[in-house]
Amino acid sequence: MQLQKLVNMFGGDLTRRYGQKVHKLTLHGGFSCPNRDGTIGRGGCTFCNVASFADEAQQHRSIAEQLAHQANLVNRAKRYLAYFQAYTSTFAEVQVLRSMYQQAVSQANIVGLCVGTRPDCVPDVVLDLLCEYKDQGYEVWLELGLQTAHDKTLHRINRGHDFACYQRTTQLARQRGLKVCSHLIVGLPGEGQAECLQTLERVVETGVDGIKLHPLHIVKGSIMAKAWEAGRLNGIELEDYTLTAGEMIRHTPPEVIYHRISASARRPTLLAPLWCENRWAGMVELDRYLNEHGVQGSALERPWIPLTE
């Protein structure tokens, strides 16, 4: 594969800027979700099974222990980003967040902080806290789970917020100089390529620094799993994902960094689509598609030109 020559990928971007490989280490901060505990809603998003975020052992380790454990598993990197991934990693009092984030960045060889959260859980005090780390020289990314820009779909999947909420949070973050990475799902019920391209267009118009693309995973324990088991919902086919994600990449400005272009999961948690068991399947097909049809930005006549590392 030669994805770095076809897509402005986060790994390549980090290597160019830091002069060496930088690896993300995922953390479980013990946070909850306001869309489950009644603060915003109950039941959670219809695609979500929170147990899939982290293994049980990870949940019971300290931040320092989690980072040390994961760093030992990474052979090719000596610099790391601390990534608070599970649940809603800004859903706590600011003093609790400060303690968590500080524990992470104070560990050896941590050069940055990535915080995954919902657009409706990022008050000004949290943005200001993240800015403190940015101003100290850390690489800081606010990762917002948007999934889609279509309010009808957001309601259908029980997200508990609308696209306007995402726009407000993104604009406030970027006004402070924070980098925003938006998570988008391809294959949501009722959406096809046209809707996904519309989502991309609206995200780019709002302003964004990075994007994560993710095929819809139907996972055990989710509300969607019940629809799948009843035959009312199908997982997205690899061919359809490749076509839609490929066109989204081709319609993305070259300066936007792709943090991820596919995602995998394992059985028994994963019910469908089973091609997502293979972490390389989506990337191999996208590599082929983009080689045939054009690189990131080519549909805008602004093709991605790889920079010398």
Residue ranges and their predicted role:
Residues 45, 104-110, 198-212, 281-297:
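Structural recognition of alpha->loop->beta junctions
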Residues 23-27, 80-85, 113-115, 140-144, ...:
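Hydrophobic faces of well-ordered beta-strands that scaffold small-molecule active sites
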